[in-house]
Every structure is written in structure tokens, then in C-alpha cells.
Amino acid sequence: SAEYTEHWLATTNSTEKTDQGLTAYLALDDAFMSIASRIHLIRKAKHSIDLQYYIWNDDFIGHMMLHELLKAADRGVKIRLLLDDQNGTQLDESLQALATHPNFEIKLFNPYKYRKFRAIDYLFRLKHINHRMHNKLIVADGVIAVTGGRNISREYFDASESFQFTDLDILFFGDAVKNANQTVIQFWNDDLSYSVQQWSGQGTKQQVERSRQHYLQDTQSHNDL
């Protein structure tokens, strides 16, 4: 992830504070503010968005985030999404489709060798497959980030009808984002990170458009949340 000198948060004062090694932060204990902060970063990004998540569910919240990322990619923002393969295969078709976009790169961390019969991995490859990535991070333009305890799923954002998790995130801007950028690079280039095409196949442009319409319809149907 690059740190861009020209970005939407750049002011003389903010640059001076960052040069002094200072970091501004905001605790996001409210679930709505937490998801809104992520979406705001995606919508304001001009150059790049890097994301790393342990859980990204095939639900309304997951679809809304993917829809926002796809719109960002459409306007020229470079997207890098790293997901732990603990998610399962529910998102495979969507990820295949999105990875065909020229501005959208997707990798799986430590993918299961037998992705549709995972019990085999647990029986014979437990030591290897137990090495998971629990990161929960989004960095926009290399200068502002959100991290914390929330995965991308309804239960983390007061959008589930059954139960909710109580978590805390931090929105931060300044010198500490350099560490977040280093984390992005470290895990993205890790030997256990594989492109989604290597493990779940190649998508098509038709799939991208189907996914786009599906995300839009799902998001519109939940406007009351």
C-alpha cells in the first residue's frame, strides 16, 4: 500500500501532525458508526483501498461492502482484498467475478486444499490449516484506517434478527497508519496468500454484472436498517 501525498485528507496542519509522529483516533463503539466509517472510507478513496478480514459473510452487510468496493473499482480505485479461507465457499462465485475487474485483486489466506470437503484437511493437515489470519483492517489511500474486533457480517453491525456481537473499532489517521500499511504488505505478500483464481477458478464479465445487480437489489431491500 502506498502513502499518497495528495489525498482527500491532506491539509498543511494534518501533514505537520503526521510528520511529528502523531495519530488522531476515534473509538467506534456504535455499530452504525462503525459500518458507516468503513463505507465513508471506500467512497472517499481516490487511489487505493486495502482490506484484510477473517470473516466476510455472504449476507446483506457483506454484499453492501462488496457493492461499495465494486463502485470504487469502477471509478479507478485499486482494491486489494485479502480474506481468510475460513469463510467457506459461499462467496466463491462473487469473488471469482470481482477478481476479473482490472482494479480488483482478491487473495485467500491459507486456503483449504480440499475446499468443499474440509474435513479431510482437518484430519490430515490440521497443523497447517490451523494457521489462520484474524486481521480486521481497511486502509484507504494509505493514510486512514479502521481496525478492531468487527468482521464483515450482520451480527457485528446490529443488522441480525437473531443475535448481535458487541465490539469496538478504531478509526485512525496519522503516523500509526504506517504500521497498518506494513501489515497489509506483509500478509498480502505472504507465501500463504493465494490469488482467488488459483483456488476457486476464473470468473466472467457476465458474472460481474450479475453480482452488481444482486448487491444493488440486496442493499435496496435493506434500506430500513
Q: Can you say where each PLM-predicted feature lies in the sequence?
A:
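Histidine-centered active-site/metal-ligand motif
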Residues: 134
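Charged, low-complexity intrinsically disordered terminal segments
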Residues: 1-131, 140-225
